[in-house]
Amino acid sequence: MREKNYQYRPCLHGKKQRLKNRVLVTKVSATSDKQSMKRKNNIYEKIYSMENLILADAKARKGKADQYGIKVFDRDKEGNLLKLQQMLINKTYKTSPYSTFLIYEPKEREVFRLPYFPDRIAHHAIMNNLEKIFTDMFTTDTYSCIKHKGIHGAARSVKVALKDVEGTTYCLKLDIKKFYPNIDHAVLKSLLRRKFKDQDLLWLLDEIIDSTNGVPIGNYLSQFFANFYLTYFDHWIKEEKRVKHYFRYADDIVVFSDSKLYLHQLRSDIADYLIQHLKLTVKDNYQVFPVVARGVDFVGYVFFHTHTLLRKKIKQSFARMLANRRNDASINSYYGWAKHCNSKHLLKKLLHDKTV
């Protein structure tokens, strides 16, 4: 399926011209982003260079040196890297079988895991060369799994937006139904071919994409595939719909406006775009509400115009973590979360009373 997309031409003059500019006139809106105009080639040989594979191994093992798979790999590190290089050169690389497990925070999800060798090294070898290409395409309004952005980057941007009190009277909050499992392989491959023309690279990406249904949560590559899958949608929101206050973290979307009617119409437009172009559906539990009434629950915080609180479930998990004296890394993570909101009294209570 070839995704249709459009470019919004800026208004020049007069009512007639404004009406004309509302017509969908040119294919591929994301090509207005200069980073998306040029298709990339000659990448594959950089992926299998020994220098890149050594770097990929170093990145993939960071903080995980005690894992059994890494210890096995290290028994013949040089030989194993040469094997991986030959798999890539000869195009005999095939994704290994996945193991799966469940996580329950922040919600129950099935997580997929691949062996350290050859898969996790191969994924890092790919992203050493593709990460900047992908991130250069992303709009400034997406935050998940992007260096120097993430949860706290999203929180900072929402706080800045809410300083425009009149322009953020109402909030549209929605997310996509089973986003990762429902990513369509044919659509994802089509989008990748709009960006890359290196046929060997596309073979490798196709092999990984087709290794399971949807895009598996837990793969290093998956977070980039997911953001890339929605990046043309992000550009449509910003460049054609001209939405000022828009924020996306993975499949969680928040939009602010001074008009409830506008947000309801935008939700309908978003649902139409996602189903027509990306074969995705918006969950039925979307919300349009006044910010002052209950705040905006997003990326672990509840945002108001005047202050920011920690989400109730995060607060409860933090309290349990402290009460049970679980690992320090997790406690530090929750503490870092709490520091970025109005939590002085909460922290004082938790750190002294160990209860909420």
Segment roles from a protein language model:
Residues 63-71, 96-121, 137-149, 207-227:
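Short, conserved non-catalytic motifs in the polymerase core
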Residues 1-33, 38, 115, 124, ...:
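Right-hand nucleic-acid polymerase module
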Residues 80, 87-88, 141, 155-250, ...:
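Conserved polymerase palm-domain catalytic core
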Residues 271-280:
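A common structural junction motif
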Residues 27-43, 127-184:
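Active-site-proximal segment of RNA-dependent polymerases
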Residues 74-97:
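Amphipathic alpha-helical blocks
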Residues 1-82:
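Non-catalytic, polymerase-adjacent accessory regions of viral genome-replication enzymes
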